[in-house]
């Protein structure tokens, strides 16, 4: 009799635990959705005639974007979730086959990434450049693009240069005119050959209150008017060591 009661009690605890986990999951998803689409954004104003004329005098520039820990963070089903708090909902999944083994990635989008891409795609030609394998990077880029055709140009691990256990990214392979190309990347090593063509950003894993992408918009809005991005970005060299 006592054993039966214990079994029922444990079953009840298990059920309550699952219900609580489900409630926490749904609550966290709603919080993330609210933060992602909250109306506090970078306000865009129509350009004045003077600004339009100034912009017409310079060439349209190329903005290169890293993926992992810059725009998104992911973990796969064979890797412990030590970078993401338990119960944090993912935004989408990516299923790929690596070395004949099926791998499922759970992908978390950095807060405001959709709005960020919408805005900067109006100012720049966007390029994805990731040190990840193409089969994974392409699937993630497809999800971020979401049918908008703003992330059509993509470079992957095979386009990187091996460098002491890591990878560097050759921006000149994308655009030989270095005065109109720059990269946003959380890893300074990735652009160490092009420090004057880079904007550092702090690595992101799961902080739902992160506003790094929004914070970059005023600078990116102004940078499109310059003749040479290096004239501005070369002043940021001290920032690359912070990340």
From Swiss-Prot:
Domain named FCP1 homology: residues: 56-223
Membrane topology category: Single-pass membrane protein
GO CC, one annotated term: endoplasmic reticulum membrane
Matching InterPro entries: Dullard_phosphatase, FCP1_dom, HAD-like_sf, HAD_sf, TIM50
Catalytic activity: O-phospho-L-seryl-[protein] + H2O = L-seryl-[protein] + phosphate; O-phospho-L-threonyl-[protein] + H2O = L-threonyl-[protein] + phosphate
Cell compartment(s), UniProt: Membrane
Sequence intervals crossing the membrane: 11-27
Family assignment from sequence similarity: Belongs to the dullard family.
This protein's name: CTD nuclear envelope phosphatase 1 homolog
Designated gene of the protein: l(1)G0269
